């Protein structure tokens, strides 16, 4: 007899009800809970899966390159980046009739899907110029994906499985990851920029055929070996340089010009090469700092154990943290997710403010899509960090090992942490909403002059300190006499000051009362999300209400009818609630960014400045006004090339609304419904010839909530993605 799913849990495989399937799916990735799992085997499986993960990523990027080379218009776009709309791929099956064929063929021989990914700009910036090069890149990544799949399989074979001690050798891992993963990859990227991208931007082709014979700098390596490095910064591209040609180009490869290339409005390639070289040096040095074979360098345990403030106010300090972090994968994952979440959000900010790719800042829809995309990913990563932090407290935390150290002391004064976060959230919520509602009321009664409008003075001061002249604060970089200005005047400052005060760039946008209010609304969302997540993690082991909570695991619905009030207090419930707040907050962040930019791009920043001070302004002048391209994507008379986004907009709403069906009605309702359907099925001729192997039962409360949350999240994001793309491309096509 075939073994039933799931093979990793004999107890579940023998369950006679449909919960076998749902619990099987729910615990498929909870590797440490699987039958017969040892710690060593767990580490080995996770390690091998990393190769598979990388293979999938490279296969995906290979597909992007292949489809653009095959069905896109990359070469045409390269010849005129500002006037050509980049194509992602053709639409194979335009079965919606003649009007669809026309709508999606606009200016092309066949119907196509326009790309808003920024890939064209990226490939162009790093030196791609022809479809042939895209094909070669695609095949290269395909081969790399194959190698990684084989490597993943290989590391599961008994001979090639690393030992547990190898996984827990922190110093070796730090050295290799810092110098190898971060240092040498940055050095390799510097090499690519210097040898391929910079020459390409000056009209010089460097490919596999000539890269060994084309020196990136006329002086060769002589300045490097003689210590005369400034030669590499001399004669940079001029302000009149025409990208992709030799006109106005220089010879510099490592510069500190500051600001943007005047034509492409992106960072200077030679500045970026210099930046990556500096990062490479820092990380390669950092990767030689930790003590391994030679008895020299830092030892992490010694460093952590020595971190005990002499006043004794932090107790045992960091004693015990080395063992705790080394032995807890959840703690390590939580830290990694938090760092990656911050980095992803920073990527969202810098992608538009300090645009690295040629002509990206002229492609408004792509900029909006990339910002929104990265902020949502950052939100999921940050919530995941806290979720695994909570799992760490439930499964991996050892009170004896951490006695009186910073971790234990944090748990001991969790009430102070939670109540302070609660106070901050209440303060932000009541004051911000109070101001919005006041402004709404006076505007509704025809007295807009009675609005309470705050000038964001501190933020303006920070902008002025960075060189923004419009506020006339005359401080630091905004003052020509400041020592800070004098220090950078010969190097990067002129380029930076030109960029920060140029109305055509996104660097430090002018702000006012609307920005002040929405900033505090976002702060409210961030603090409430943090409050829920922090409370969930700090109360994960136990609380006054339920001191033995850790014995129930990470996710449990309630402790039966016997203990009233124990529903909704598992660490998983905190994650569940925080997800809604996270999505809510990122909604505010992306609404703010998109609306402010829409008005700037449209030459009407006054609309944002006036309407963003009250809630009706947001609903009417941002959401409703900009949804018109989606509402008019198709009608009884036909359709246009935005109709696909209209359908996605509707479909997103449908998925989102379906979520509430699972979120509002609880398990008993579904169980009764299922029992009624079973009764009807068993009494229906012909239908009752079909029997089920598993007795149908409703999802558990936790599972139904998960299904609801997934629908809510997916629907919410699909709806807003369609809105951003259609409203922006409809206006600025």
UniProtKB/Swiss-Prot annotation:
Binding site for chlorophyll a B1: 653
An example molecular function term from Gene Ontology annotations: electron transfer activity
Localization (cell): Plastid, Chloroplast thylakoid membrane
Keywords, ordered alphabetically: 4Fe-4S, Chlorophyll, Chloroplast, Chromophore, Electron transport, Iron, Iron-sulfur, Magnesium, Membrane, Metal-binding, Oxidoreductase, Photosynthesis, Photosystem I, Plastid, Thylakoid, Transmembrane, Transmembrane helix, Transport
SS bonds (residue pairs): none
Residues that hold chlorophyll a B3 according to the record: 661, 669
The keyword Chloroplast is assigned to this record: yes
Membrane topology category: Multi-pass membrane protein
EC assignment: 1.97.1.12
Biological processes annotated in GO: photosynthesis
Binding site for phylloquinone: 670
Pfam families: PsaA_PsaB
Transmembrane parts of this sequence: 46-69, 134-157, 174-198, 272-290, 329-352, 368-394, 416-438, 516-534, 574-595, 642-664, 706-726
Annotated GO CC locations: chloroplast thylakoid membrane; photosystem I
Binding site for [4Fe-4S] cluster: 558, 567
Chief place where the protein resides: plastid
Self-association and partners: The PsaA/B heterodimer binds the P700 chlorophyll special pair and subsequent electron acceptors. PSI consists of a core antenna complex that captures photons, and an electron transfer chain that converts photonic excitation into a charge separation. The eukaryotic PSI reaction center is composed of at least 11 subunits.
Family named by the database record: Belongs to the PsaA/PsaB family.
The protein's role, per its UniProt record: PsaA and PsaB bind P700, the primary electron donor of photosystem I (PSI), as well as the electron acceptors A0, A1 and FX. PSI is a plastocyanin/cytochrome c6-ferredoxin oxidoreductase, converting photonic excitation into a charge separation, which transfers an electron from the donor P700 chlorophyll pair to the spectroscopically characterized acceptors A0, A1, FX, FA and FB in turn. Oxidized P700 is reduced on the lumenal side of the thylakoid membrane by plastocyanin or cytochrome c6.
Identification of the protein by name: Photosystem I P700 chlorophyll a apoprotein A2
């Amino acid at each position: 007899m075939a073994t039933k799913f799931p093979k990793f849990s004999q107890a579940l495989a023998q369950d006679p009800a449909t919960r076998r399937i749902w619990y099987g799916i729910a615990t498929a990735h909870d590797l440490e809970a699987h039958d017969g799992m040892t710690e060593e085997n767990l580490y080995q499986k996770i390690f091998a899966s990393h190769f598979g993960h990388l293979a999938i990523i490279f296969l995906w990027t290979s597909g992007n390159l292949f489809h653009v080379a095959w069905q896109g218009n990359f070469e045409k776009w390269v010849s005129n980046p500002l006037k050509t709309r980049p194509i992602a791929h053709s639409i194979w099956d335009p079965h919606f009739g003649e009007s669809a064929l026309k709508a999606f063929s606009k200016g092309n021989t066949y119907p196509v899907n326009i790309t808003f990914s920024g890939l064209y700009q990226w490939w162009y910036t790093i030196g791609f110029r022809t479809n042939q090069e895209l094909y070669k890149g695609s095949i290269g990544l395909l081969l790399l994906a194959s190698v990684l799949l084989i490597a993943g399989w290989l590391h599961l074979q008994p001979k090639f499985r690393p030992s547990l001690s190898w996984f827990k050798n922190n110093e070796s891992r730090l050295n290799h990851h810092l110098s190898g993963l971060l240092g040498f990859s940055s050095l390799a990227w510097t090499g690519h920029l210097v040898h391929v991208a910079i020459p390409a931007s000056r009209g010089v082709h460097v490919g596999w055929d000539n890269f060994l014979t084309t020196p990136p700098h006329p002086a060769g390596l002589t300045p490097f070996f003689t210590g005369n490095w400034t030669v590499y910064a001399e004669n940079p591209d001029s302000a009149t340089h025409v990208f992709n040609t030799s006109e106005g180009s220089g010879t510099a490869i490592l510069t500190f010009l500051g600001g943007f290339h005047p034509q492409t409005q992106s960072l200077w390639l030679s500045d970026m090469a210099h930046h990556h070289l500096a990062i490479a040096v820092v990380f390669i040095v950092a990767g030689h700092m930790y003590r391994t074979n030679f008895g020299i360098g830092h030892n992490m345990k010694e460093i952590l154990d020595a971190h005990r403030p002499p006043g004794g106010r932090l107790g045992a300090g960091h004693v015990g943290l080395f063992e705790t972090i080394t032995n807890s994968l959840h703690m390590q994952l939580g830290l990694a997710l938090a760092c990656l979440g911050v980095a992803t959000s920073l990527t969202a900010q810098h992608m538009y403010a300090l645009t690295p790719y040629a002509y990206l800042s002229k492609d408004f829809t792509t900029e909006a899509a990339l910002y929104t995309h990265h902020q949502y990913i950052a939100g999921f990563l940050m919530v995941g960090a806290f979720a695994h932090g909570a799992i760490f407290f439930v499964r991996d935390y050892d009170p004896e090992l951490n006695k009186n150290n910073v971790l234990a002391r944090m748990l001991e004064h969790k009430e102070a942490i939670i109540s302070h976060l609660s106070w901050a959230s209440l303060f932000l919520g009541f004051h911000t909403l109070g101001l919005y509602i006041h402004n709404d009321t006076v505007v509704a009664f025809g007295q807009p002059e009675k609005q309470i409008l705050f000038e964001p003075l501190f933020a303006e001061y920070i902008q002025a300190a960075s060189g923004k002249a419009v506020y006339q604060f005359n401080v630091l970089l905004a003052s020509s006499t400041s020592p800070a200005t004098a220090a950078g005047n010969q190097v990067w400052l002129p380029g930076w000051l030109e960029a920060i005060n140029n109305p055509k760039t996104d660097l430090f946008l002018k702000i006012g009362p609307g920005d002040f209010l929405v900033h505090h609304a976002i702060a409210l969302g961030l603090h409430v999300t943090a409050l829920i997540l922090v409370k969930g993690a700090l109360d994960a082991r136990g609380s006054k209400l339920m001191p033995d909570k850790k014995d129930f695991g990470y996710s449990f619905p309630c402790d039966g009818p016997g203990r009233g009030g124990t529903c909704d207090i598992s660490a998983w419930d905190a994650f569940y609630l925080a997800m809604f707040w996270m999505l809510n907050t990122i909604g505010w962040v992306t609404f703010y960014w998109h609306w402010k930019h829409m008005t700037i791009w449209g030459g009407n920043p006054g609309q944002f400045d006036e309407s963003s001070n009250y809630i009706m302004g947001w609903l009417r002048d941002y959401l409703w006004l900009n949804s018109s391209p989606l509402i008019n994507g198709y009608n009884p008379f036909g359709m246009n090339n935005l109709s696909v986004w209209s359908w996605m907009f509707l479909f997103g709403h449908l998925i989102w609304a379906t979520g509430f069906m699972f979120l509002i009605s609880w398990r008993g309702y579904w169980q009764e419904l299922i029992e009624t359907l079973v009764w009807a099925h068993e009494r229906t001729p012909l239908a009752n010839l079909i029997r089920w192997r598993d007795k149908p039962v409703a999802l558990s409360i936790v599972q139904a909530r998960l299904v609801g949350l997934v629908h809510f999240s997916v629907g919410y994001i699909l709806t807003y993605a369609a809105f951003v793309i259609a409203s922006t491309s409809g206006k600025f096509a």
